[in-house]
Amino acid sequence: LFRSGEAGQDTPLAAAASVSAPIDLAATCRNLMRPCNWLSHFMLLRQMKREALGPGAALTPAERDGIRKARTLWQFDEQFTAPRNGFADVADYYARCSAMEFLGGIRIPTLVVAAQDDPWVPCAAYLGQHWSAYESLCLLPLLPEQGGHVGFHGVGSRHPWSDRAVAGFLAFHR
């Protein structure tokens, strides 16, 4: 959504789809850090630290130290991601890189799927959008009450409902 909104008409894509995308990075980070998400938060942070510190990583000693000391995703982004990528701070990074700021720039048919019961990505950012106000009229939001985070398990099918919805949408817009 971020890249599509940023690109506008300058895209080779005929259509796009998004499932459970974190369109508000700050809210998603806060949600992931809730006690009920501690295991997912821990695993995601560990993976991010492992990748950032991996072989061949060109890091300064201060960056390595910041990554190692980060105990939350917020701290990781505050101590490493934001400064490494030229942002003033973590709030600046989250604000400027959140996809909800770019939705109005999307100029291709785009399916947006997000469950209202997603434990990681808060649906409030989706529900707070004025979808009909977007000039492009290219955005189709599907915001079911249930589905979890990329769950959308379909009854009677081994393929998740969201996969079938995305495939149908993209096939229609070929």
Task: Show which residues each predicted segment covers.
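Catalytic histidine-centered segment of alpha/beta-hydrolase-like enzymes
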Residues: 141, 147-161
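C-terminal alpha-helix
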Residues: 165-173
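Acidic beta-to-alpha connecting loop that harbors the catalytic carboxylate
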Residues: 100, 116-119, 146-148
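Alpha/beta-hydrolase-fold enzymes
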Residues: 2-84
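Conserved loop-alpha-helix segment in the C-terminal half of the alpha/beta-hydrolase fold
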Residues: 116, 120-140
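Active-site nucleophile elbow and catalytic-triad environment of alpha/beta-hydrolase enzymes
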Residues: 79-102
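Short beta-strand/loop motif that positions the catalytic acidic residue
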Residues: 106, 112-114, 118
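Short, conserved loop/helix-junction motifs that constitute active-site signature segments
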Residues: 10-11, 103-107, 130-136
